[in-house]
Amino acid sequence: MGATKFVLFIVEGETDELALGRALTSLFASGEHPGPRFGIVRGDITSVHALGAGNPASTIKRRLVDAVKEFLAKDKLRVTDLDAIVLLSDTDGAFIDDSLVIFDEDEPRCSYFEDRIETSNVASLRQRNQCKSSRLKTLSRTHELTCNKRKIPFKAAYMSRNLEHALSDCSGRVTQQKKYDLARKFSKKYGTDVIGFLELLTFLAPVGSYQDSWVYVARDNNSLLRGSNMKQTLEALPSSPIKAVSSL
């Protein structure tokens, strides 16, 4: 029998792992799969700031592979230890039409609503949306990454409009401390409640397959609405932990 493989989740920050780590570990364990590992890149690698405005969308694949290699080297693991790679990303309303990015001179950053984003820097936010949505579309059509000449199954999961909105129904601007508080609360509630966790993922999931979930979030203002395709992502993994659970 070969060595046990694990799923690597590439996430933006520590609160992603704090919120989802125990719940996902319990879910994987229910199907007798090893718990997932988390590689934290500390920032949105689909953004302009991470890759540069002039880089093509395909650059995101190279950045992802670099992040995987860094994680494996740090933990002294091999590519052959990977069962699959999952990128978890916030949508940040990136797929909305430019007309829904509204000027507000009193808003130094941006405020998110279900039907618009308000900001004092419209041009910059529209550019961010164009770059981020292009890269996410590329990833939604990517089904494997090549790392050290080995092809590893890949899926992209999204939280809409962000982790706090999707998991905790918190739609306002939150401080870093608030993010940690929400993540701890979520972990405490769902960390060992596999059925409850799956019920939430089912509630957040759009109708249809993994690919359908990306068609949905790219339509209209859906990337501003609360939702996630984590359920479809987990179902699409080679060793799906969801398929091992008999009931939802």
Language-model segments: residues:
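C-terminal accessory helical subdomains adjacent to catalytic cores in phosphodiester-
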Residues: 2-4, 18, 22-58, 62-248
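Catalytic nucleophile-elbow at a beta strand-turn-alpha helix junction centered on a G-D-S/GDSL motif
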Residues: 8-20
